[in-house]
Regions:
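N-terminal [4Fe-4S]-dependent radical SAM core
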Residues: 1-2, 54-55, 66-103, 107-137
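A short, structured N-terminal alpha-helical element that caps or precedes a catalytic domain
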Residues: 1-67, 72-74
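Core AdoMet radical
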Residues: 5, 10, 46-50, 114-203
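Generic, ordered loop/turn and secondary-structure boundary motif
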Residues: 17, 107, 146-147
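Short, aromatic/basic amphipathic alpha-helical patches
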Residues: 18-22, 56-62, 77-79, 153-158, ...
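Short glycine/proline-enriched coil/turn segments at helix->beta-strand junctions
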Residues: 27-30, 37-43, 59-66, 95-97, ...
Length: 203
């Protein structure tokens, strides 16, 4: 199959779903590229959109089109298990960091946040070794990893592996300050640039 990918939000931040789809299709012998609306010829095109404020792609492709992502207000479509748990194709964006979720969901029910509606309560997603590949740095997209025993176990594993990480959604400052074990654990982590804390409130 000839597969085209469209990152509707642009290429400023790697789209994790597209990297996983690319890895899966390449593993099955398919050709994969970012879709070219003028010269490309495809059997299927995947369009992924994270942000609702991003205008939709208006390009015309005369093939099967799959649109998904929170940007389409699609909170039910998920990747098949065999795609969800594959090591992403980091060559798609030419990045030198791994990207992924250790956990999904959140224990909080902040009324302004889409995470509880989309992902539910916190649960394990993937161990770090599942998506790190050959990279020595990882950008982790968890929403509240410190609220998960599995998440804390994976941070311990990250320390043992000696890789540098960035929890780019921020770590819950309240949980860290209330638990000396968490503070000690975070002190042992190698950070890509700096540690990010978050303390979301309505104010």
């Amino acid at each position: 199959m000839r597969i085209g990918l469209v990152d509707v939000d642009g290429h400023h931040f790697p789209n994790l779903a597209l990297m996983k789809l690319s890895a899966w299709h390449k593993a099955h012998g398919d050709s994969v590229e970012f879709a070219d609306p003028m010269f490309g010829r495809y059997d299927r095109v995947y369009m992924s959109k994270v942000f609702t404020f991003t205008p939709d792609c208006s390009d015309v492709y005369r093939c099967e089109i799959v649109r998904a992502g929170t940007g389409y207000k699609d909170y039910t479509t998920v990747l098949p298990e065999e795609v969800e748990h594959i090591t992403p194709d980091y060559s798609l964006y030419g990045v030198h960091e791994a990207y992924g979720f250790l956990t999904r969901g959140c224990v909080n029910r902040c009324p302004w946040c889409i995470v509880p509606h989309k992902e539910g309560s916190i649960r394990p997603a993937s161990p770090i070794r599942e998506f790190i590949g050959s990279q020595r740095r990882a950008v982790l997209l968890d929403n509240n990893v410190l609220a998960s025993d599995f998440g804390l176990e994976q941070i311990e594993e990250i320390v043992r592996m000696g890789i540098a990480v960035d929890f780019n959604q921020g770590l819950d400052a309240r949980r860290a300050c209330d638990d000396s074990y968490i503070l000690d654990l975070l002190a042992r982590v190698k950070w890509i640039r700096h540690i990010r804390f978050a303390c979301d409130t309505m104010e």
